[in-house]
Amino acid sequence: MTGSMLKRLFAAAALLLAATLLSPAQTGTWSGELDVQGTRLPIVFHLDEENPTVDSPAQGARGIPVEVIRTSSGGVTIKVPSIGATYEGLWMIKRIVGTFRQMGASLPLTLTPGEEKLNRPQTPKGPFPYAQEEVSFSNGDAVLRGTLTLPEGYTRNTPALVMVTGSGLQNRDEEFFEHKPFAVIADALARSGIATLRYDDRGFGESTGDIVNCTTEDLKNDALAGIRLLRERFDKVGVIGHSEGGTIALMLAAEAKADFVVSLAGMVVSGKETLLWQNRVALTATGVPAETVDVYCKALSEVFDACMAGEPLPSVGGYGLTAALAQNLAAVSAQLQTPYLKYFIALDVRPLLGRISCPVLAFNGTKDMQVEPWSNLGALRDGLPDNARKQVEAIEGVNHLFQHSRTGMVDEYREIEETIAPEVLDKMVRWLLCCE
């Protein structure tokens, strides 16, 4: 499963258990972890009798209302009609043992009292030497709500940036396993005299909008609406984007909508190339034999090609894959029916780079296992005009989230206490101040 798709699974799983187990003996906070292909996804239930809720700290999804059906024998059935999910559990004195099901998939979940608190020392804590305003802006039917961070003594000449998250549903802080990288970046920039606008993704948090039929183009236009909001108050407006958000930043720069852009682990090569590389890395890391990896990636490439050509997708059973890999390929084929993934695999910003005339800062981590650093940075260096003001740099030893890491794999994100490498923040601030 790809990193991008895994994040979307996180988003779905954050809601998948959107129900609370409630009985007189089951009040307070209960938590457990889903094992999503080797990555732990914490789920936290707050068992208030009147307003039970569930949180998914990994996705920054909190306070989701839930409903529950109990039996006299200690069983519980939890239904989530909005996503077609059901959880069935059994009270076992000091734990609740159960299984959730959605779209034919089943995963075990055991809950125990309390909630694990993760140490995140870089998360900003007040009082702050800058102002924050809650704002909203619209793109068609989508209403985006977010936070405008304003440095002390700001004027129209203060540089300002729209912050665009990566793929998958995320809140304005781009929260992931209780890390809040966008909050950390906004804090660092505000302390250096730079304003930012960060917002909840459409259809998530406090924002509304269609997420079923949207594509990266729609997400780009959401960010463009944020640029328009900032231009009402600031003369110099740029974009800072992470992962898919970095791709969106480059798309906006090519359309001359931004005065400067920062791409953090942005995808420059095509979505197809990125997903194939992600799959190869993930399968190899889990010990799948090289020959099997080659066969699976060949099959995946042919599925992508057929989708982009508008042809019927190849039969999953024709590649001699193991049952698990055949099931995964079938799941990918099903997801290719969605507008988002159809658009994403064909997305390639390389032809757009020659149109960019504004300053560009691009970082990729050398241990990024979701967006391959060298091909993407190389494409930027080669594609941007020779006269463009550009800084394209590989940051040594950091992963896709720009944490210092051992392997760069997704399963380390939660365990690392650092949210973002200080040298990345420092380089970003110094570059932005030089753009003034």
Regions found by a protein language model. Give the residues of each.
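Conserved alpha/beta-hydrolase "acid-adjacent" motif
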Residues: 369-375
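Short, surface-exposed "cap/lid" segments of acyl-processing enzymes
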Residues: 153-157, 161-188
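Alpha/beta-hydrolase active-site loop
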Residues: 213-232
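Central antiparallel beta-sheet cores of small beta-barrel/beta-sandwich binding domains
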Residues: 26-91, 97-102, 122
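Short beta-strand/loop motif that positions the catalytic acidic residue
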Residues: 356, 362-364
